[in-house]
Amino acid sequence: ERLADSPHLAEIREYSMRGMPIYAECGGFMVLCQELQINGKQYPMTGIFPARAEFCPRPQGLGYVEATVEAENPFHPVGALLRGHEFHYSRCVALGELEPTLRLSPGVGMSGPGHRAKGLAAEGPDNLKSRDGLLVRNTFAAYTHLFAPAVPHWAARFAAACRKNA
């Protein structure tokens, strides 16, 4: 409840609207969603992404992942291979159109095991299973925790995005 009442949520949203670079992983991903659901109760978040992060009683993603970048963004070039891990007890439910930028193999990504996001197909490219990474303006968020030494382009591209939008 304290997070939902924080004035910082509005500040984060304003920074995103102005195009400032924001890069979030896991808990940061949840803050950038429209809402967070815990024990059936919903709390408003920044609303940058039209999605709800729902906490579950069991892990929804656990283990090492490799992610292939499928959409251009300020932080990762198309075709880049990202290495990291996922460990999350929440899943992403689409409340509007979502266009994931990463394909995981292995990995669960935004959708928990056996879960389909609202309005998206059970199979094919529109399924959130094994998908991760949302982008709006210069705001990127994913459940995947990068292993930075294995993603050498990341720091330089993040710094360049910051310089460009200073």
Can you describe what each PLM-predicted range is?
Residues 1-75:
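Cysteine-nucleophile active-site neighborhood
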